[in-house]
Amino acid sequence: MEHQLLCCEVETIRRAYPDANLLNDRVLRAMLKAEETCAPSVSYFKCVQKEVLPSMRKIVATWMLEVCEEQKCEEEVFPLAMNYLDRFLSLEPVKKSRLQLLGATCMFVASKMKETIPLTAEKLCIYTDNSIRPEELLQMELLLVNKLKWNLAALTPHDFIEHFLSKMPEAEENKQIIRKHAQTFVALCATDVKFISNPPSMVAAGSVVAAVQGLNLRSPNSFLSYYRLTRFLSRVIKCDPDCLRACQEQIEALLESSLRQAQQNMDPKAAEEEEEEEEEVDLACTPTDVRDVDI
C-alpha cells in the first residue's frame, strides 16, 4: 500500500491566470509596431504563384478550419496557420498538388506553438485521406520554418481582441459574448484572401465592432453604440475611422455571403430556383433607368 501512486491528472487543461500587466498600453503599442513584421505579401498570387489560385486557397482554408474545429484546437491555431500559409506562398511558388500538404504542415506548426497537446503528423495525414505521409509532412515542416526564418510567433487578430475588451467598460457577461462572436469573425476573415491587406489589429477591431453591431447589446453608458465604439477603437489602433468602418462592413458582407452559401449547400434545389428567379429579373429589366441619370 505504501508504494501506491496517487494520480492527480485532470482532463481539463490548466491555464495561467489573466495578467493585467500583459494588457497595458505599452504592450499594445509594441504589438502595433510589430504586427507588420510578419505580414504576407498582398500580391503573391500575381507575383509569385503560377498554379495556386485564390479559389484554391479558399478550399484549403475551409478544410483547415474544419480540421481545427473537429479537433477542438485553440482559437489562435487556425489564424496562425493561415498566417504561415500566406507568408510561405508570398515567398515560394507551390504546385497545386502540394497545397494541402502545405496547409497540413501550417496547422502542425501552429498547433505546436499554441496547443498544450499539439496535433500529431499521423492525425493530420488521416484528415488528408492519407494522400500525404508523415515523412512528407515532417520534411515540409523543415522547409516551412526555414522559409519563415523561424519567425513563428506571428501576431494574429486574436492577440488584439483581449486588449480591446479590457478597455471597454462593459459587464463581463457582455464581454464573453462579444469575444466569442469576434473570434468567429476572425476565423471567417482568415479564409478570405481579401483580408490579407488588413493588419491583424484592423481585423480584430472590425470583428469586435461587427460582433457588437450584430448582437445589438444594450449598454447602460451607451459605450456600445456603433459610432462611439468605432471612434474609440480607431484611436486605439491609430487608424482612420472610415478605414475601420470599411473593414467592419467587409466582415459583415463576408458573413452574409457565407451564410447564403451554407444555406444553398443545405438546400441545392432552393438555390437553383433562386438563380432562375434572378435570371428572370435580369432579363425583365434594363441595366440602368435613364430617369436615374443626373445630367
Swiss-Prot record:
Cysteines joined through disulfide linkages: none
Acidic residues composition-biased segments: 272-282
GO-annotated cellular components: bicellular tight junction; cyclin D1-CDK4 complex; cyclin D1-CDK6 complex; cyclin-dependent protein kinase holoenzyme complex; cytoplasm; nuclear membrane; nucleoplasm; nucleus
Cross-link Glycyl lysine isopeptide (Lys-Gly) (interchain with G-Cter in ubiquitin) placement: 269
Subunit note: Interacts with either CDK4 or CDK6 protein kinase to form a serine/threonine kinase holoenzyme complex. The cyclin subunit imparts substrate specificity to the complex. Component of the ternary complex CCND1/CDK4/CDKN1B required for nuclear translocation and modulation of CDK4-mediated kinase activity. Interacts directly with CDKN1B. Can form similar complexes with either CDKN1A or CDKN2A. Interacts with UHRF2; the interaction ubiquitinates CCND1 and appears to occur independently of phosphorylation. Interacts with USP2.
Cyclin N-terminal domain location: 28-152
GO biological processes: cell division; DNA damage response; endoplasmic reticulum unfolded protein response; fat cell differentiation; G1/S transition of mitotic cell cycle; lactation; liver regeneration; mammary gland alveolus development
Alphabetical UniProt keywords: Cell cycle, Cell division, Cyclin, Cytoplasm, Isopeptide bond, Membrane, Nucleus, Phosphoprotein, Repressor, Transcription, Transcription regulation, Ubl conjugation
InterPro entries: Cyclin (IPR039361), Cyclin-like_dom (IPR013763), Cyclin-like_sf (IPR036915), Cyclin_C-dom (IPR004367), Cyclin_N (IPR006671), Cyclins_cyclin-box (IPR048258)
Stored Gene3D superfamilies: Cyclin-like
Location(s), subcellular: Nucleus; Cytoplasm; Nucleus membrane
Modified residues (Phosphothreonine): 286
CDD domains the UniProt entry points to: CYCLIN_CCND1_rpt1 (cd20573), CYCLIN_CCND1_rpt2 (cd20576)
GO MF term set: cyclin-dependent protein serine/threonine kinase activator activity; histone deacetylase binding; proline-rich region binding; protein kinase activity; protein kinase binding; protein serine/threonine kinase activator activity; transcription corepressor activity
Protein name (Swiss-Prot/TrEMBL): G1/S-specific cyclin-D1
Similarity section: Belongs to the cyclin family. Cyclin D subfamily.
Described function: Regulatory component of the cyclin D1-CDK4 (DC) complex that phosphorylates and inhibits members of the retinoblastoma (RB) protein family including RB1 and regulates the cell-cycle during G(1)/S transition. Phosphorylation of RB1 allows dissociation of the transcription factor E2F from the RB/E2F complex and the subsequent transcription of E2F target genes which are responsible for the progression through the G(1) phase. Hypophosphorylates RB1 in early G(1) phase. Cyclin D-CDK4 complexes are major integrators of various mitogenenic and antimitogenic signals.
Stretches for region Disordered: 262-295
Post-translational modification: Phosphorylation at Thr-286 by MAP kinases is required for ubiquitination and degradation by the DCX(AMBRA1) complex. It also plays an essential role for recognition by the FBXO31 component of SCF (SKP1-cullin-F-box) protein ligase complex following DNA damage.
Lineage top rank: taxon: Eukaryota
Predominant subcellular localization, coarse grouping: nucleus
